Amino acid sequence: MGALRPWHIAVLVVVLILLFGAKRLPDAARSLGRSLRIIKAETKSLHDDDRDLAEKADAQAGYQPMPPQVQQGQHPQQSPYPAPPQQQPVVDPVQRTRDS
């Protein structure tokens, strides 16, 4: 049930021809194709703009791309950021007993 069969497609084509007419159907398909091309071009330009802005922000902040992987036998470079300080566990000076 739910599988699309060839006769389903044939019925769909007949309904489309009846609704839009044989003369308007190619024009509708052409305008739909143009719209899809425009949407594709706009989303690509938005994606490229986002990438350009990210690269510009990284350049302004002084970030550099990650260095290539360290080869065997070489020491890795130290991170330019200091390691976070080690936190010591908090000890409660007052301990409760069950008798109190």
Swiss-Prot record:
Regions crossing the membrane: 1-21
Protein origin, superkingdom: Bacteria
Segments of skewed composition (Low complexity): 69-78
InterPro entries: TatA/B/E (IPR003369), TatA/E (IPR006312)
Residue ranges, compositional bias (Basic and acidic residues): 46-58
Subcellular location field: Cell membrane
Region (Disordered) location: 46-100
Gene Ontology BP terms: protein transport by the Tat complex
Protein topology in the membrane: Single-pass membrane protein
GO MF annotation, one: protein transmembrane transporter activity
Keyword Lyase: no
GO cellular component: TAT protein transport complex
Keywords associated with the record: Cell membrane, Membrane, Protein transport, Translocation, Transmembrane, Transmembrane helix, Transport
Family, per entry: Belongs to the TatA/E family.
Subunit structure: The Tat system comprises two distinct complexes: a TatABC complex, containing multiple copies of TatA, TatB and TatC subunits, and a separate TatA complex, containing only TatA subunits. Substrates initially bind to the TatABC complex, which probably triggers association of the separate TatA complex to form the active translocon.
Protein purpose: Part of the twin-arginine translocation (Tat) system that transports large folded proteins containing a characteristic twin-arginine motif in their signal peptide across membranes. TatA could form the protein-conducting channel of the Tat system.
Protein known as: Sec-independent protein translocase protein TatA
